[in-house]
């Protein structure tokens, strides 16, 4: 708003002397040319000053500003973003703003000193200079015109800046995703060509998701992804999917979720451009849209990482919620209102029961996912899953009822309120013929069956209120295990399992290897023995802290020849690049666990090897396992028994060392426990041992320590030498029997002995540990010399029956021949 224009100068200030010399006028004109528009300001300022000094009453209270920098009128001040530290909506640090403001003030003061005090003098200073007395009314009109044009320019500049800011905020996704990030990825060489992802375009995948797929390097969808995506993303159906491990089930449900959320965001953006109030309301709240449950913490983090990679350039947040980590930190993550939450049932229910607002407000939940559902339904596990399912809002498939039954639907846009989709994925699937009829009945009696136990995938799907038209995708009928998986076994005793395992790791230890145990005690024993033998192994089991488990997983991913010893909890869904070998140190208790164990290798159409160590006590379980997998023949892993004596020598020393160290550590732990508890209770420990017993104990400990050092030294000497077969002799080397490989190995061994630098590191692929044999992967050894053995119980029984019949037949023939000979002898005697 502008104030009234300043009045003309009073008559006493106008020059009334006609004898004014013309030199003054010329000086004024020169000043006008040099100082531009500042002359009218000084004239108005002089007029205001003279008026105030004359004591006249000024009606306009803002007239005193006529000579200031404001230009004689009031207007909205134009804010410079740089002056207030605002860049793209973000405010700089206040201290930095103050420092910048101080620098600007100093610069202005320096300018004042250079120009002189008369340029910035305020009315009432008493020493104003009048320079344009002869201009009169023409000068005032010129000043007003310049002020109007200046005001229009400022308003226009402000409008342009505001429009540019709105454009940046509205097109933030397109500019960021299609601009800088894409350009950076292209420069890095991580994106495939557009013609290489034609199969994804046929599925009508969102362009931003196609960009993510190109960046991840997925040229075409896997069969499970191709089958599930149209039904889930475009038809809005529930999906029950089953496929072999490593087939891409995570993106099979992850991409439809991201597709739907992106489409809803685009609709919301279009509506917000038409109605600004809707945009303000939508920007305030981001409700929970997708809840994904997994049985293990590692799998939850892996699923979260995969979804984050797919949604890297999207305005969609994905947060993992698992046990073993700080609840306070996870609550802070949930305060950000992420659209997708991936977690385990235990920690999710713990946060729900404490009243976390983001998790209990499920009115806008559009996706509910159960990954590895066959593990979820095991009896005695995941009681929290049933409680979480009971908290889900009841919807019968109509949008109107969903809106009516939502208590706080005012904060959720209508386009976000969708029929909830339920996804159930597993590596195994067993559904009855009338499963769809059960689902139809389950929708009516969902509340009545809420108290039933989740004993099967059918019961789980029924309680999760899946719709009768759910899409069932079962790709496990032909082959449950990966196609390129080579299965094998080794028959040995329980005591020899360690020896054969060490043989595999030392002779064929190439590539990443996972060793599975059924018990934590066996895992600890095995990892301790392998570490004594110089093999650096990683461990992962349920009694470890979550940070240690995550660290072990990261270290396993980093090294190409790493070895991990884990329990069955690690067998579910974990995806590692290029795991070459899986070893079953102990057979699992069920076929499903065996499938998940073996599925850690041969993923993404790559080859892999599985080796099972079978003891006499495991034979019945092993044959039952083969029968359930419809396997009649299985390859027996080739073992060169000439190396086993050298392996047993090392293993014997390692077991003795491990036994002594375990005993010492147990004694130290007991002593520290007694001392710690005695100190906490304020008691003094008294030893009842006599002096002789103490001396005897000291001597025994000293002898044990000396024995331990000797054993360690002997083992170190053995480990410094390569494994030698029993028939190998260094004294008598037949020239004809020395192969080029053996000759090369002997030359290398002699060089090492001369240099004195022989060392063994079990995790280096270039190490030399075996004489007479080149180090190859177990898969290659199995393909080269593996022999198929019948593992079918029925066939073995048939073979035994045939062998028994043949034996009886032979016995009868022998008996008949003997009787025939006796008769002939008797007849011959009678004749004589």
Swiss-Prot record:
Key word ATP-binding present: yes
Reactions catalysed, as given in the entry: ATP + H2O = ADP + phosphate + H(+)
Bias kind Basic residues: ranges: 29-42, 105-114, 141-155
Motif Q motif: where in chain: 198-226
Positions of the Helicase ATP-binding domain: 230-447
A Pfam family recorded for this sequence: DEAD
EC number annotated for this UniProt entry: 3.6.4.13
Ranges annotated as biased composition (Basic and acidic residues): 156-167, 814-832
Region Disordered: start-end pairs: 1-59, 91-173, 800-832
MF-aspect GO terms: ATP binding; ATP hydrolysis activity; RNA binding; RNA helicase activity
Domain named Helicase C-terminal: residues: 484-645
Motif DEAD box location, chain numbering: 371-374
Assigned keywords, A-Z: ATP-binding, Helicase, Hydrolase, Nucleotide-binding, RNA-binding
Superkingdom: Eukaryota
SUPFAM superfamilies with a match to the protein in the record: P-loop containing nucleoside triphosphate hydrolases
Family: Belongs to the DEAD box helicase family. DDX24/MAK5 subfamily.
Domain comment in the entry: The Q motif is unique to and characteristic of the DEAD box family of RNA helicases and controls ATP binding and hydrolysis.
Name this protein carries in UniProt: DEAD-box ATP-dependent RNA helicase 13
Organism: Oryza sativa subsp. japonica (Rice)
């Amino acid at each position: 708003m502008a104030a009234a224009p300043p009045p003309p100068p009073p008559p006493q200030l106008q020059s009334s002397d006609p004898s004014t010399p013309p030199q003054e006028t010329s000086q004024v004109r020169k000043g006008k040319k040099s100082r531009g528009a500042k002359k009218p300001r000084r004239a108005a300022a002089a007029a205001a000053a003279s008026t105030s000094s004359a004591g006249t009453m000024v009606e306009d209270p803002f007239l005193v500003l006529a000579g200031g920098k404001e230009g004689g009128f009031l207007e909205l001040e134009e804010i410079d973003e740089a002056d207030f530290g605002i860049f793209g909506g973000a405010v700089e640090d206040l201290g930095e703003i103050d420092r910048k403001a101080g620098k600007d003030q100093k610069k202005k003061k320096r300018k004042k000193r250079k120009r002189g005090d008369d340029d910035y003098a305020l009315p009432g200073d008493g020493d104003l200079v009048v320079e344009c007395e002869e201009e009169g009314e023409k000068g005032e009109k010129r000043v007003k015109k310049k002020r109007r044009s200046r005001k229009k320019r400022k308003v226009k500049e402000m409008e342009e800046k505001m429009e540019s800011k709105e454009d940046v905020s509205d097109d933030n996704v397109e500019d960021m995703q299609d601009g800088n990030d894409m350009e950076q990825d292209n420069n890095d060489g991580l994106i495939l060509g557009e013609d290489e992802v034609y199969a994804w375009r046929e599925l009508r995948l969102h362009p931003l998701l196609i960009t993510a797929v190109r960046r991840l390097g997925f040229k075409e969808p896997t069969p499970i992804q191709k089958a599930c995506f149209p039904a889930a993303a475009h038809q809005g159906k529930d999906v029950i999917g089953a496929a072999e491990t490593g087939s891409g089930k995570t993106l099979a449900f992850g991409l439809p979720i991201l597709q739907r959320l992106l489409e809803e965001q685009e609709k919301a953006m279009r509506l917000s451009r038409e109605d600004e109030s809707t945009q303000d309301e939508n920007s305030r709240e981001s409700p929970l849209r997708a809840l994904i449950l997994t049985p293990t913490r590692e799998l939850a983090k892996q699923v979260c990482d995969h979804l984050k990679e797919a949604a890297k350039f999207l305005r969609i947040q994905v947060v993992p919620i698992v046990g073993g980590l700080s609840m306070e930190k996870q609550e802070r993550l949930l305060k950000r209102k992420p659209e997708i939450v991936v977690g385990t049932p235990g920690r999710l229910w713990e946060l729900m029961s404490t009243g976390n607002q983001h998790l209990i407000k499920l009115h806008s939940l559009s996706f509910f996912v159960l990954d590895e559902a066959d593990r979820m339904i095991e009896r005695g596990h995941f009681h929290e899953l049933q409680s979480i399912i009971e908290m889900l809002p009841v919807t019968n498939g109509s949008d109107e009822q969903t809106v009516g039954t939502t208590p706080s639907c005012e904060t959720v846009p209508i386009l976000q309120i969708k029929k909830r989709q339920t996804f159930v994925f597993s590596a195994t699937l067993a559904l009855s013929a009338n499963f769809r009829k059960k689902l139809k009945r389950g929708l009516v009696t969902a509340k009545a069956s809420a108290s039933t136990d989740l004993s099967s995938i059918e019961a789980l799907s029924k309680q999760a209120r899946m719709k009768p038209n759910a899409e069932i995708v079962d790709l496990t009928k032909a082959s449950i295990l990966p196609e390129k998986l080579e299965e094998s076994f080794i028959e040995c005793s329980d005591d020899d399992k360690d020896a054969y395992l060490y043989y595999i790791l030392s002779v064929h230890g190439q590539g990443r290897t996972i060793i599975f145990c059924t018990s934590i005690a066996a895992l600890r024993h095995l990892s301790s023995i392998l570490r004594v033998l110089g093999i650096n192994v990683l461990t992962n089991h349920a009694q470890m802290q979550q940070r240690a488990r995550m660290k072990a997983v990261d270290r396993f991913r980093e090294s190409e020849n790493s070895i991990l010893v884990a329990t069955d909890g690690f067998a579910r869904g974990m995806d590692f690049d290029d795991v070459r070998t899986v070893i079953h140190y102990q057979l699992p208790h069920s076929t499903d666990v065996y499938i998940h164990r073996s599925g850690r290798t041969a993923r993404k159409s790559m080859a892999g090897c599985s080796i099972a160590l079978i003891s006499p006590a495991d034979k019945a379980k092993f044959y039952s396992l083969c029968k359930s997998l419809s396997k009649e023949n299985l390859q027996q892993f080739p073992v060169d028994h000439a190396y086993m004596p050298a392996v047993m020598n090392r293993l014997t020393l390692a077991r003795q060392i491990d036994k002594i160290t375990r005993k010492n550590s147990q004694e130290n732990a007991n002593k520290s426990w007694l001392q710690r508890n005695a100190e906490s209770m304020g008691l003094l420990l008294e030893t009842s041992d006599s002096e002789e017993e103490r001396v005897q104990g000291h001597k025994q400990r000293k002898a044990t320590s000396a024995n331990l050092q000797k054993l360690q030294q002997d083992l170190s000497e053995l480990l410094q030498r390569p494994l030698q077969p029993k028939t190998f002799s260094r004294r008598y080397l037949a020239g004809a029997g020395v192969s080029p490989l053996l000759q090369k190995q002997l030359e290398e061994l002699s060089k090492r002995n001369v240099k004195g630098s022989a060392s063994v590191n079990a995790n280096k692929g270039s190490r030399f540990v075996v004489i007479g044999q080149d180090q190859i992967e177990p898969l290659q050894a199995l393909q080269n010399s593996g022999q198929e053995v019948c593992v079918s119980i029925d066939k073995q029984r048939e073979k035994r029956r045939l062998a028994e019949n043949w034996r009886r037949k032979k016995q009868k023939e022998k008996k008949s021949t003997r009787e025939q000979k006796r008769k002939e002898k008797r007849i011959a005697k009678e004749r004589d």
